[in-house]
Amino acid sequence: MELVIAKHAGFCFGVEKAINTAFKEIKNNQKNNSIYTLGPLIHNNQVVSSLESHGVYTKDSISEIDDGSVIIRSHGVSKATYGLAEEKNLNIIDATCPFVKKIQNIVEEYFNKGYKIAIIGNPEHPEVIGINGWCNNEAYTVQQITDVDLIPKLDKVCIVVQTTMPIVQYEELSTLISTKSNQVEQFNTICHATKERQESAKLVSQEVDAMIVIGGYHSSNTQKLVAICKEEKPLDTYHIETVVDLDLEALQNYNRIGITAGASTPIWIVDEVVKSLRNL
């Protein structure tokens, strides 16, 4: 069996920054103050469990935190959430991905200039929810073509996109949204790491008999990788979270297997999968 590992796979810059920020806070916490993350730091259960073993616990809202430090997750949060944390005198540690922070700044700037905001992305994803919180939660969120029909004619509109959206989906939807106004400011805010991982996964999936995509089942960027691989290998793409999820009986029937991993997947999880397959 030959294994082909995607050139771009695993931790992205934003995720690595968030994890390093969290463990730095753990190391510097000499007074054993309470440390929390607002929502899962990243969409990876193994990393979240590791943080909990070091005394960093996940809370869903500021109302659940009375003291100590709160780490803002890589997906970012609304402007109002910062205000609530400040009101409670919490120590705010901002681990927002820099690329997400850039979107928040764009949205706030153009909203204050009188633009309506259109966010291309999943309205239920924490990144999109957080971004919407920088324009008073008044954005039009567009995930599919039918969502564009709900947007009225606008004087001026600013278009941004969730960092993990497929480029093809962004291009199609942004073109349609642009027809809603004569004054359009458009920003392709897809993270370059997302684009690299998607392109790399597509290339590998064209060269192998089966694809394994490693990443959290709730990870948006991992789900996008699965969808891309299934375009090439609809019946031979396997989404797993860890090595224990491998269907070794099915996989031993393939000659060439491709491997990629979501941006929230630690390298040690990838290594465990590779080792297990090489022992077949």
From Swiss-Prot:
One of its GO terms (biological process) is isopentenyl diphosphate biosynthetic process, methylerythritol 4-phosphate pathway. Its EC number is 1.17.7.4. NCBIfam families: ispH_lytB, PRK01045.1-1, PRK12360.1. It comes from Alkaliphilus metalliredigens (strain QYMF). It holds the Pfam family LYTB. This is 4-hydroxy-3-methylbut-2-enyl diphosphate reductase. Belongs to the IspH family. Its cofactor is [4Fe-4S] cluster. Catalyzes the conversion of 1-hydroxy-2-methyl-2-(E)-butenyl 4-diphosphate (HMBPP) into a mixture of isopentenyl diphosphate (IPP) and dimethylallyl diphosphate (DMAPP). Acts in the terminal step of the DOXP/MEP pathway for isoprenoid precursor biosynthesis. It comes from the Bacteria.
